[in-house]
Every structure is written in structure tokens, then in C-alpha cells.
């Protein structure tokens, strides 16, 4: 199953027997960044009694962490983590903060509530994949650029160009298309190979 991630923050809400569950799905590059977000929530929402969470990070190995934050063991963090795992989401985390409503939910009720609250914040999330691209750089003449501009723009609609005595061109190509693009450019330029990959970039692609 393909690993996915998110951009931007999305929120959800669940009420269960007068207890309110507010959930947040946020992109995170590190545990420190995710824990910083939780600390910020605690400072701004002191009336909440629990801030349960789960996060999955890949850089490059997979790291998973879940916290019940005072709820009975296994009733909060694990269900939240299960939601992330089912969607195969990485480099993001979910925090569910609870405002107690006066009625105990029991272990089964808590597990269900935290799971549903976690799912609710995913509903509006912008999900996608991080795709590897290569930045291609090269310097060519004006006549040569006229021969390949259309081809370059098929792969990058907004190539970067700097005009002088010659033209410096930079454009992005998906890594799985590099060999094809280089071959097409070589053919169009009569055997010349002015471009080469200089940098790898991971770019978000919506699904």
C-alpha cells in the first residue's frame, strides 16, 4: 500500500455522552515539531483534560509513537495510531483533546470515541504522496531553446530561465521520467546533452 501524507491542518469533532473530542491532523517532520504542536494546544486549551495523540514519521526508517495522556492504557493513543496506519499516512500526527462531560465511557466507549474522533479530522484532509523530482540545469543558445521549449514545458509548465548571451534553463522532472526526457532532449538538439540533474526534491502530489 502506497504511503501518503498531508498538507495543512485539518480538524474534526465528536460528542459522546456530553464529553467533547476535538481532533487535529497536522503534518510533522519530527517528533519535536509534533510535540511542540501538542504543547501549544495545552497552553491554549487548559479546560481540556486529555491530549491523546499518535504520530508516524519516516526519515528514512518508520517511527511510530502513541500517547494515552492519562486515559486507560490502550484506549486512546493506540486507536488514533490505528487510524493513521489504516490510511498509511506518514510524516503527520493526530491529536485528540477531550473535554470531560461527567459520564465515564468505559474502555470500549473510549476506544470507539477516540477512533471516531481521529477519523473525523481526516475527512477534510488534503492527502497525497511525496514524489521525487530532479532539478535539471543547463545552458543553451537561443536557437536551441526554440527547439526544445515546448518539450520542456510538457514536464514543467514554469521552467526558470535567465537570458544573456545564452540561456540558463532550470526545470523539474519526475525522477521516473529523467531518462526519457534526456533522450528526447538529445534527439531534439542533434546529439547535444546540455542538461543534467543537480538536485533532488520531494514534491507533494494530491490524490
Where are each of the predicted segments found?
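C-terminal regulatory domains involved in ligand/effector binding and gene-expression control
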Residues: 1-74, 194-206
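Short, flexible turn/loop "capping" segments at secondary-structure junctions
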Residues: 14-19, 129-130, 161-163
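A common structural junction motif
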Residues: 44-48, 155-160, 186-194
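Terminal alpha-helical anchor/extension segments at protein ends
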Residues: 117-122, 129, 189-207
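Short glycine-/aliphatic-rich beta-strand segments at the starts of folded cytosolic domains
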Residues: 126-142, 169
Amino acid at each position: 500500500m502506497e504511503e501518503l501524507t498531508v498538507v495543512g491542518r485539518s480538524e474534526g469533532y465528536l460528542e459522546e455522552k456530553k464529553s467533547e473530542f476535538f481532533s487535529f491532523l497536522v503534518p510533522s517532520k519530527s517528533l519535536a515539531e509534533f510535540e511542540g504542536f501538542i504543547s501549544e494546544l495545552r497552553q491554549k486549551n487548559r479546560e481540556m483534560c486529555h491530549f491523546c495523540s499518535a504520530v508516524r514519521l519516516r526519515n528514512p526508517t518508520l517511527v511510530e509513537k502513541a500517547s494515552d495522556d492519562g486515559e486507560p492504557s490502550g484506549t486512546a493513543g493506540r486507536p488514533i495510531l490505528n487510524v493513521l496506519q489504516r490510511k498509511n499516512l506518514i510524516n503527520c500526527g493526530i491529536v485528540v483533546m477531550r473535554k470531560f462531560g461527567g459520564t465515564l465511557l468505559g474502555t470500549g466507549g473510549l476506544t470507539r470515541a477516540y477512533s471516531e474522533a481521529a477519523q473525523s479530522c481526516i475527512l477534510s484532509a488534503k492527502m497525497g504522496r511525496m514524489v521525487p523530482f530532479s532539478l535539471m540545469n543547463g545552458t543553451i543558445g537561443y536557437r536551441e531553446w526554440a527547439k526544445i521549449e515546448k518539450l520542456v514545458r510538457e514536464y514543467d509548465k514554469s521552467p526558470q530561465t535567465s537570458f544573456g548571451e545564452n540561456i540558463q534553463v532550470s526545470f523539474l522532472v519526475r525522477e521516473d521520467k529523467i531518462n526519457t526526457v534526456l533522450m528526447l532532449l538529445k534527439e531534439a538538439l542533434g546529439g547535444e546533452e546540455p542538461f543534467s540533474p543537480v538536485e533532488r526534491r520531494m514534491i507533494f502530489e494530491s490524490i
